[in-house]
Amino acid sequence: MGFVLTTSGQMQIVVRDDAAAMTKLLKLPVSKRLGSLAAMRGVSEFDEPAMKQLRQIHERGDGFRVGVDDPRYPAALKRLIEADAWGQLKRDLARAWEYQQSVLPGIHHAETVDVVLTLGNPDDPVFIERTLGYYGMGSIPGSIWMVAWPTDYNVTRIGACGVHELAHNIRTPNVEGHFDLEEWVIHEGLAEVFTVEVCGPDSTGAWYAPVTGKLLESTWKKVTEAFGTGRSFPDWTPYVLGDEVAGRMGLRPVGVPHMGGYAVGREIIERYLAATGLKAAQAIVRPTDEILAGAGLKPRTKS
């Protein structure tokens, strides 16, 4: 989607409260649900690339299945509504942007950020058990997309997940150079620590909580030794998201635990912040090489 960048400090965060529309959608015949979903998302059914992406999410990805009449769906949607998931997003994203502006005004940002939360697929064990039933994508300025299947853990952290994605939205237009594995790992580390600064220490981190001690040491070595390698996301994904996600995408495993790159990224950022005295909201615009050096890592020559 298109977006307009500014340094005004005025960001309009538009959280699409689709709860009522999704409730109606789930009462429709299965044959009409994809069209209804497209209308909710502002997608023309004649826009083949957009419809293909929508089908990918809701037929093979982590979105709820548009071709299935599943009695669990209305109950799950009701639980998101009762948890005020969309309200969480509105409040926490507004608070996060206010915090960012108080710490470092004058940075580049999208004038408007469009935020979408959709219901997830309960039958994917990696999504439910390992990714804890929720995640988002927010690296394209002006857009945050999130998916959730409500659980006891995630229903109070939907807003925090949005804050993580807002950090990506903020960093992308403020750093120059090409995207690579190092930048992806730093993106995730910054987003995690930024979320902690805004929402507190218990708001995030469970995805990679087991990656500590000796496992973190071995993962650190595996991931940082891959810096400077690869040319695209299929090359880097196993080092960031881990072998389980890589395997389901048909990619080569590299010996990294689930979300191991997040744990490494957070460790890099925490080392950098300790060395500089900065906060993540200040470091969010700092160059990759500076952050790596501050964390005691040498930038690697690209191969």
Functional labels for PLM-detected ranges:
Residues 1-87:
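N-terminal low-structure segments adjacent to metalloprotease catalytic domains
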Residues 2-18, 181-226, 300:
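Post-HExxH zinc-binding segment in Zn-dependent metallohydrolases
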Residues 38-47, 225-303:
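Pan-zinc metallopeptidase signature
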Residues 77-141, 155:
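Auxiliary, metal-adjacent structural segments of Zn-dependent hydrolase domains
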Residues 101, 167, 171-175, 195-203, ...:
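Hydrophobic/aromatic-lined pockets within catalytic cores
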Residues 146-161:
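Short pre-active-site segment immediately N-terminal to the catalytic Zn-binding motif
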Residues 151, 174-184:
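Short helix/strand-bridging catalytic loops that position acidic/His residues to coordinate divalent metals
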Residues 160-173, 188, 192:
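Active-site recognition of the HExxH zinc-binding catalytic motif
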